């Protein structure tokens, strides 16, 4: 079950009615700041963390059996064609007392087999740049998290093999860290810093 801010037709501004088409256009263009201004908070996706192939934890791991690579949170998306897609710098709420910075892929994972365990469905796959030690490798499954999409890094890319995919994810992590280290990130993170359960179904 995925939930996210629902735009209401009308005027713009926090707490006021906004154009849902304007929000969709901003998301499609990768203008996450524009979408956040219209919604009054960063665009977010919420849901239960589900099991996937567990491929991420093997990519970039310190050893073959370590499982300490790019551990990811998988959320199935309700729509086949979400307004936003690509790779994003994100904040994850619900795993610890403070939101966790991360990098996320929202889309169909073109580098992997579309007939895998997820059946080619749209997924939000999020790698937290820091992982809470008390969760352990399996502790996030079943938890409800909210992932705020703050900044689009680039569109989805198709990599030639797992080595290229691993290098691409590593670069995305570095770019996300650079984003969070910049003053630019403060504008969006200040909009919404407290965990709040969303009850509005995503219509965007």
Model-predicted segments: where are they?
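Proline- and acidic/polar-enriched loop/turn elements at helix boundaries
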Residues: 4, 48-50
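Acidic/polar loop patches that form or flank catalytic/metal-binding clefts of enzymes
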Residues: 36, 46, 99-101
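Contiguous mid-protein beta-loop-alpha structural module that forms a pocket-lining wall or clamp
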Residues: 1-40
